[in-house]
């Protein structure tokens, strides 16, 4: 008998947490594309559940659609041109504990994004593997999460560079964010020439070896990172000053 109140309470919590979870440029605040995609997928499922059960539309904040549209565009801009090659398995960067996404996995998500935003031509282009007008090739700046994307096209032969210059307060041992300012990946003509080292190990608080490994993985030298000079802090385990 209290179902409507539970629905309202649950959705109010989601509305509140969503504003905290996503940065103003659309990226989730732990800066991991892998978890970003999962969170967007969960919110898509929630919206579908509300629609299928014919629940009140105002359970979710009207601002949520704006947040989700930005979030879907993050995935779009982070997708390598290899996505347009049939059977491709390396279609996304591996920054901040991210598993590399395959063409088929990304397409399943773009299909959902296009359902949420059926009038968006860019998402339709991604859903259909390149039918219609491609997104533009301007430099894409994600100033709040610290990512910069440069590309000269959306065909498999294109060149694309993703540069990571993250600043995050979530740098404790459990964080997905690495201390890897200056890390980059460079794609050209069907190949990623500088794939990041990606995922190291899940956290185990009582396992000293695992925790030391995670801290070691935070070092600049564990990633494809551009540095100026050979500073001592580049070699210390997980102690780089990310604000430099």
Regions found by a protein language model. Give the residues of each.
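Alpha-helical cores of eukaryotic small-GTPase signaling modules
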Residues: 2-22
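A residue-identity detector for tryptophan
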Residues: 6, 78, 99, 125, ...
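Active-site rim segments in enzyme catalytic domains, especially the processed small/beta chain
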Residues: 180-244
């Amino acid at each position: 008998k209290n179902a409507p109140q539970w629905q309202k309470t649950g959705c109010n919590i989601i509305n509140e947490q969503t504003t905290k979870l996503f940065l103003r440029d659309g990226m989730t605040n732990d800066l991991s594309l892998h978890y970003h995609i999962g969170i967007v997928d969960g919110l898509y499922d929630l919206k579908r559940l509300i629609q299928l059960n014919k629940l009140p539309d105002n359970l979710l904040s009207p601002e949520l659609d704006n947040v989700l549209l930005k979030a879907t565009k993050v995935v779009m801009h982070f997708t390598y041109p290899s996505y347009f090659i049939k059977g491709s398995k390396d279609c996304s960067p591996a920054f901040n504990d991210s598993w590399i996404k395959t063409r088929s996995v990304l397409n399943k998500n773009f299909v959902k994004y296009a359902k949420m935003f059926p009038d968006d031509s860019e998402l339709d282009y991604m859903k259909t593997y390149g039918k219609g007008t491609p997104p533009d090739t301007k430099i894409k700046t994600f100033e709040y999460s610290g990512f910069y994307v440069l590309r000269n096209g959306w065909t498999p032969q294109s060149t694309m560079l993703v540069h990571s210059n993250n600043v995050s307060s979530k740098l404790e041992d459990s964080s997905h964010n690495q201390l890897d300012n200056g890390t980059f990946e460079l794609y050209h003509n069907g190949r990623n020439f500088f794939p990041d080292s990606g995922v190291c190990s899940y956290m185990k608080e009582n396992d000293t070896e695992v925790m030391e490994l995670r801290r070691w993985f935070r070092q600049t030298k564990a990633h494809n990172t551009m540095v100026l000079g050979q500073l001592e802090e580049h070699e210390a385990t997980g102690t780089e000053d990310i604000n430099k």
